[in-house]
Amino acid sequence: KLGGTTPLEVILKFPNQDKNKSDEDDEFEDWGEGENKDDEKYWFTKDKIDKIDSVHNYLDGLPAVGKVLSFSSIIQVATQLNNNKPLGTLEMGVLYSKIPESIKKEIIDPYISIKDNEARISLRIIDSQDGLRRNDLINKINYDLENKLKLNKEEFKLAGVLILFNNLLQSLFKSQ
C-alpha cells in the first residue's frame, strides 16, 4: 500500500517583551549596542519552551499526523544526552550562544526565529489514512489550539502545502 504525506506547519508567535523604557534611560541607550547577542540567549524562557512542547505533543497525538519536528525534538535529544535531565532555560541559552553558526543554521534556525519571536512546528499529514478529511482536520487543529491549549488566534498560524491544497479543494467544491 503506497501513500504519501503532505506538509503542514504551525507557526507560534510569542508576545513581544518590550522593555520598559523611560526618558531617563535614553542617555545610556548607546551602551546596549552589543545587547542583541545577549538577548538571543534570554529568548529561551520556560513559557516559550512549554508552549512549543505542548503544541508539539498535541500534534504528535493526532492519528492523521505522521512525523512532527520542532525545537521540542531538539530539546528531547538534548535531554537524552544530558543523562535524561531536562535542560533549564539558562542552560539552553548558554548552549545556544556556544553552538557554532553552521550548526544553528541546520538544527535550530528551521524551528526558531528569535528575531521574529516565532517558533515553527513542522508535521506531515498521512494522506493514505482512511477517511482523511483535510478541511475537518485543519478546523480541528485550529479549534483545539484555541480551546484545549488556550492559545489566542494571534499566537498561531497554520501554513504549508496542506493549507494550499485544502483551499484549492474547497474552491473546487464551492464552484460545483
Outline where the language-model segments fall.
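Extracytoplasmic
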Residues: 1-176
